[in-house]
A protein has these predicted regions:
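Hydrophobic anchor residue at the start of the ABC signature
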Residues: 12, 76
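Short helical segment in ABC ATPase nucleotide-binding domains corresponding to the A-loop/adjacent helical element
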Residues: 25-33, 43, 47, 60, ...
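Conserved ABC ATPase "signature" region
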Residues: 40-58, 110
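Conserved ABC ATPase signature
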Residues: 62-66, 70
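A short, proline-enriched helix->beta-strand linker immediately N-terminal to the Walker B motif
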Residues: 81-85
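Catalytic Walker B motif of ABC-type/P-loop ATPase nucleotide-binding domains
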Residues: 87-90
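Conserved H-loop
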Residues: 116-122
């Protein structure tokens, strides 16, 4: 994947990777262009991102004072601090419990819509891919093996139990099973 402006790419990893000696506000602003913004603009940016991610009361807190979901929100805010147009999300919700994961998925969709940004979201969860993606790519040996278009015709929030979603899920699982069977034969 090539980006015309790689500096506009924000990255959120599976683990938040926050610096424990920095407050949440300092962690969020770590990737911001400090030459481009005055101190007052940076403070305003931090407040905006804290509010956007629902962390406005925790700007002065340190990572060890936060839950896993809160730390992932902070990691998302940090990715947005660099004025990202696109997000690369590498299994950011994999380590979260079911309910926190659901909340983060909804927050992620809301933030992408509000900020009008695109994302490449890596996940091993078929359900998560169906809930969040418009296009689902299944990788095989470092290349795209299969491509499914969910499309924008399925509005958010999506219902995994709808006939249409169940049909798409069956196709994806069948593809994964066939691929798994092929690999076993070698």
């Amino acid at each position: 994947i090539l980006f015309e402006q790689p500096e506009k790419l924000g990255v959120v990893f599976q683990e938040p990777r926050l610096m424990p000696w920095l407050t949440l506000e300092q962690n969020i602003l770590f990737g911001a262009d400090k030459k481009k913004h005055s101190k007052s603009k940076l403070k305003e940016k931090a407040e905006t991102l804290l509010r956007l991610t629902g962390l406005e009361k925790f700007g002065k807190a340190y990572p060890d004072q936060l839950s896993g979901g809160m730390m992932q929100r902070a990691a998302l805010a940090r990715a947005l601090a660099c004025d990202a147009s696109y997000l690369l999300m590498d299994e950011p919700f994999a380590a979260l419990d079911h309910f926190t994961r659901q909340t983060m998925q909804k927050e992620f969709l809301r933030i992408c819509a509000e900020e009008k940004m695109g994302a490449l979201f890596v996940t091993h969860s078929v359900d998560e891919a169906l809930l969040l993606g418009d296009e689902i790519l299944i990788m095989e040996n470092g290349k795209v093996g299969s491509w499914f278009t969910i499309g924008e015709n399925l509005a958010y929030p999506r219902d995994l139990l709808s006939e249409e979603m169940i049909g798409i899920k069956r196709k994806i699982i069948k593809t994964l099973e066939n691929r798994s069977q092929t690999q076993k034969n070698f």
